[in-house]
């Protein structure tokens, strides 16, 4: 029954989960990102990650087949002040699923830093957000090394336009789409069903079943559903 409930909302089996996650990301990029950039007053956003040391925001902006940065991965977003449309760019290599959501702007022979500098010249933004924050660890994912490399690579005029992007990244994280809300309701129902079973006499044997047994039963059910 749990599998049927998840399958009805596209959250089971694992292949369906992948399709669903891509659709959720597509919706967020199209619905939430333009609003977040406008509301925060930024017309450019750079999200920089390094292999084995990802910015926490990075995983919320990429597809299921590219959950971790490759060498140096840079995502760039430019909001057109006239149309409100956001150009989504991937600097460096990207996965097949990413091809449908991001423009690959790398030119032959360019390094990621040369490419980033060129994009900034093309877009000429007035306010550039990077993930630095005094208040939120989740919005403070830009490493000191990458920040120095970025400043060294771009033109001096753009260095002066870089600002801490907490106002943008918080808005990106906090706003959910209708599809996300629907899936949350599904997961909530499944969670209650798991609790109802593991706390019932269908599973618990008085005097024998321990709280640890209940914990492992919950983990097993969740794992069998393709989650962890």
Task: Give the location of each predicted region.
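A composition/biophysics-driven feature that prefers long, compositionally simple stretches
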Residues: 1-223, 227
